[in-house]
Each structure stands twice: as C-alpha cells, then as structure tokens.
C-alpha cells in the first residue's frame, strides 16, 4: 500500500488468483455493480481500485489508503441479505472490516482509521443535514481536540472515495469545510471557572455540551459555505 501505485498490486493479486484467498471480502466486490452519476453501471471492485489509485496521489499514508480500499466491504453481499435499516447495513460493514483486520492482524493505526471511517463516512457526506446533536456526535467521532491529524486523515479518506464516480468531486470539500468549521466552534467552548459557576464532575461536561449545542445551532443558521 505504500508504493507509488498500490492499486496495481491489488490488480496483480487478482490476475493471478491470489486476491481471493488473501482478501476474499475485497475479491467479492468485483462483479458487483453500482450506478455512476452519469447513470452508467460500474463494477465496485474496480471502483475501489480507482479510489485507491486517486487516494495514493493525495496521500502517502498507509492507514488512509487502506481505509479507502476497504470502506464498503458489505456491498459484496448486500444483495443476499435482508437489511431493513441503515443501522443493520452499518453493523455488517463494520463487522466484516473488523473480521478482516483480526484475521490479517492489521496494525492498530490502520485498524482504527479504517473502522472509524467505515462507521462515519456516510454521515459525513450528510453533515449539513444533521441537527446539532447529531453533528456534535459526528465531530466528536472524527476529530480530536488535542490534534488535527485525526480529522485530516478522515478528510483525506473522504476525498479519496469522492473520486470513484459515485459522488461529485467537490462533495468532500464542501462537507469538509462545514465539518471543520463546526469542529472549531465546538472546540472554542470553555468554562473558565467551573467552581465559580457551581459546577463539578459530570456537570462540567454537561454544561460544555449544552454550550456547544447552542453554538452549533447558531452556526447552522448562519453558515454560508465560504
């Protein structure tokens, strides 16, 4: 995955029949069709390789490239299962990815980013439609107040999969701008003197969340996209 063209490695594995025994979840994506924005049908396996190829041009990070490659493994068996809700589909996606990571003993950094990305990328692309409480939950999951690295890696993954033909190339940039602004607003909330305000223990966290929700509500009303 750290080579200049990691998608070629996957192609060669499949060409010589080695992908199926090593990565059956990925191999099963080939032959599964999805509809492009131009209404043409396209193969999910090749879509994953295109996303990987373009992600490799965005980032040299192994965890980012891996997360993009395996973000939608459930699509290989989705047609064979009764999934009555988005939550069941999400559960399947995450459980398949966890099984792959366990079986292949995937390094921790790769595992954490890929699972977090698989769990939240669909919500990310709907960020502007989320009510404040769900928006706060999303930014808490994809960012870390002590470091920008977690969110930047997540955003790189989003940019990578937005180039597979299913989404507009600008979709990740628009959602990224919105979520980044929301993160900055949420992180700006502080309580200077909890004792003076009569707060202690869990009350401090609850008050911070209350203030964050109020600021995010105002943010949603006024966000211009600039």
Question: For each of these PLM feature ranges, what is it?
Answer:
Residues 1-56:
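Long, charged alpha-helical interface segments
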Residues 28, 45-226:
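C-terminal subdomains that position terminal phosphate/3'-OH groups for nucleotidyl transfer/ligation
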């Amino acid at each position: 995955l750290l080579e200049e063209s990691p998608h070629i490695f996957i192609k060669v594995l499949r060409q010589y029949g080695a992908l199926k025994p090593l990565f059956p979840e990925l191999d099963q994506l080939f032959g599964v069709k999805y509809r492009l924005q131009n209404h043409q049908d396209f193969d999910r396996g090749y879509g994953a390789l295109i996303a990987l190829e373009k992600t490799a041009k965005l980032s040299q990070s192994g965890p980012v490239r891996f997360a993009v490659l395996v973000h939608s493994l459930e699509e290989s068996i989705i047609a064979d299962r009764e999934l009555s809700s988005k939550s069941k589909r999400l559960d399947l996606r995450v459980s398949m990815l966890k099984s792959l990571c366990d079986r292949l003993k995937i390094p921790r950094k790769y595992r954490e980013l890929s699972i977090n990305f698989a769990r939240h990328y669909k919500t990310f692309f709907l960020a502007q439609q989320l009510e404040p409480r769900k928006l706060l939950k999303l930014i808490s999951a994809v960012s870390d107040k002590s470091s920008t690295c977690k969110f930047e890696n997540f955003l790189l993954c989003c940019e990578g999969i937005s180039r597979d033909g299913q989404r507009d190339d600008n979709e990740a940039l628009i959602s990224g701008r919105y979520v980044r602004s929301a993160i900055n607003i949420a992180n700006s909330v502080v309580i200077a003197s909890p004792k003076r305000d009569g707060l202690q223990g869990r009350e401090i966290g609850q008050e911070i969340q209350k203030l964050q929700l109020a600021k995010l509500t105002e943010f949603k009303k006024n966000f211009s996209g600039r």
